[in-house]
């Protein structure tokens, strides 16, 4: 029997906790689930609500030739505009948590200094690939700081296993993994191999998420979580890579598989199903609470990653309504056709067992939702860097 770590929160009614009643013979994890908002718009604990979703749209204003990539001149104009009119957005240049040792340059590395791999997959746990990023500008870090949380990527040439990829889009990713890390220190990166061209991929993948493990000196927590979780539910794969930027070694990053349509096709049998990300936020409200039949309040919480249409939102709203309004004795029969109960229970067990400090059961945020080929919704772990 698994015993709860804390008593039930007063007035707690997180929807996923309701169907945990179905498994009380096996474990009593219900008390650990995150507190549901007392009313739509009011997150747990009196927080101010989730941070704004999405990114500041700037690209179209400066992309004069419409190629989706800003050249050096276009980026310079965009940077000047952003300095003069800084947008309201989440996060700013990383400041860290206090005095830090001034960063020192990493050692120089070339392609001749590292091992190249052949047929091994991108997320093969036995590999430690080296990614060489070459930016046009020497102040690439300052440039990416100024474009953080906008829709502008800084283009780079990337060399992996001796193969060259041009016009790869790069930007800093993350919330606390960005804002809590000072300039000159390792920050998480997002690489888009299809920024300008539709076909280029790195070993079949269009996107790389390189995480700095800013709260984990061992670098092992998210990778171990991923390895364990893959035995029980659909989970992004992870391993390690080394990153060299403009000839300077920036060290090892954990590399996480993108929650993409390719991920959905591989795990759920369709690339056409609806997908959502619930962004991380201390005041997250992504508890699957029923907020009415209008999709507007849901769009302030759940960031849709697939086609934004009424059918997708109706599916999500249907699940939340069943979770919140169905009598316990009828809940399993009503929920099973539209929601994978078994994988959700495993997801919750993993969240608790692995002590995820930034997920559903603590913040009702920082997880994903995907629709399978049968029209059922699944919950999917995300990031896993605070376990």
How does the language model describe each region?
Residues 3, 9-23:
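Bacterial N-terminal signal peptides that target proteins for export
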Residues 63-67, 71, 358:
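Acidic carboxylate motifs that coordinate Ca2+ or other divalent cations, activating on Asp/Glu
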Residues 35-57, 79-387:
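Phosphate/dinucleotide-binding and metal-coordinating scaffold of catalytic cores
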Residues 10-12, 32-38:
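N-terminal acidic, proline/glycine-rich, low-complexity intrinsically disordered segments
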Residues 1-4, 34:
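Short, basic, low-complexity termini and linkers enriched in Ser/Thr/Gly/Pro
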Residues 74:
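Ca2+-coordinating acidic residues in Ca2+-binding motifs
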